[in-house]
Amino acid sequence: MILTTARLNCRPVTVPRLFNRSFSQSFIILKKKSSTPTEKVEEDEIDVNELLKKAETQFKKTLEIQKQKMNEIKQGNFNPKVFNSLVFKNNRKFTDIATTSLKGKNALLITVFDPKDVKTVISGVLAANLNLTPERVPNNDLQLKVSLPPPTTESRLKVAKDLKRVFEEYKQSSLKDSLGTIRGSILKEFKSFKKDDAVRKAERDLEKLHKDYVNKLHDQFQKVEKSIVK
């Protein structure tokens, strides 16, 4: 009887069933907790890659802006926009009363919109100290011819100096389009992410990208400089 009672007392034991329920609940909790960091890492990787694309887009834009600026400087007085920044009496802009075009290889042609403004344009160009003299075109009351002097060694050196200044500005300065400013802005955005392997790699990739575009910017400058100082 004692043996029988022992056996009967052992039957109601439900430890296995309680153990299974507890294990199942623990597994679900762990699964939820482990999935959240993974999703966050994937989101971070997507975000930092987007920032790298953003940086390269802005770097390319800087390269194009410098190219445009250097071409304008290279043209010097041969640039039809040479008078566009002039402002006359009563705050009237040159572009409001006249326009300029190239005339052959060694001259500019100013076309004034109103005959009454011809004298204003002539005196304004002379006062700008550009070493350029507008002359009336015979039988045309609206046009002025500006003969362009051939470039000298001094003028070439000045152009080269201006080109170097533009290069330095777009490499590293407070300009919003300078490579240095763009790099600093992207690095600041990286700080909003947790410092994991993906972010560290993105920072290294940014530094490499920045260095590549500094070299491209410098190559662009040297190419234009060589065409000036021969």
Swiss-Prot record:
Q: One cellular component GO annotation, for this chain's record?
A: mitochondrion
Q: What protein family is recorded?
A: Belongs to the RRF family.
A further note on this protein reads: Present with 1440 molecules/cell in log phase SD medium.
Q: What is a GO molecular function of this protein? A: ribosomal large subunit binding
Entry-linked InterPro entries: Ribosome_recyc_fac, Ribosome_recyc_fac_dom, RRF_sf
Compartments, as annotated in UniProt: Mitochondrion
| A single BP term in Gene Ontology | mitochondrial translation
**Record key words, sorted:** Mitochondrion, Protein biosynthesis, Transit peptide
- Identify the Pfam families for this entry: RRF
Indicate where this protein is primarily found: mitochondrion
Function text: Necessary for protein synthesis in mitochondria. Functions as a ribosome recycling factor in mitochondria.
Q: Which SUPFAM superfamilies match?
A: Ribosome recycling factor, RRF
Key word Transit peptide present: yes
| Name of the protein | Ribosome-recycling factor, mitochondrial
